[in-house]
Amino acid sequence: MVRVPGFSFVQPVVWLSFGSVQIHLFDRVDAVPTYQHVGLEVDDFESVYRAVRQRQLLDKTFGHYCYELPDGSVQLYFRDPAGNLIEVDWPDVRNLDRKVISDIRLLSEDIPQVPGVDASLFLNR
């Protein structure tokens, strides 16, 4: 396992990689958090977005439900019907139809980022 550069978030986080897999470890000292989640890459981000929005499952645990990260990747957060927090990832915001998804917020607008960090949500791309 190797530590890799990561973006800044509200709480301290360490990004680790092993092979083509990443794990992000958050450091919290307060009560059991409600932000524990699984992150998934999908083949059709826009279809997932439409389905989640239609079912009113979008979740603002992290301040907003759809963020563009500094590397151009996108994260969408929602709760499944059982209440589990799900993160859906997309590698390139430029490949999304902004008429379908018009509410993507820049992470850097909410959380200042460290300039020059060579981080990527997607490894080897």
Mark where each language-model region is:
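Core segments of cupin and vicinal oxygen chelate
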Residues: 1-22
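Short acidic/glycine-enriched loop/turn segments that link adjacent beta-strands
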Residues: 8-12, 32, 69-74
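Short, charged/polar surface micro-motifs in flexible loops or helix N-caps
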Residues: 19-22, 30-32, 43-48
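Conserved beta-strand in the GNAT
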Residues: 24-26, 87
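Short, solvent-exposed beta-strand edge segments and adjacent coil->beta transition regions
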Residues: 33-37
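Vicinal oxygen chelate
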Residues: 38-85, 93-96, 111-125
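Short, compositionally biased
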Residues: 100-109
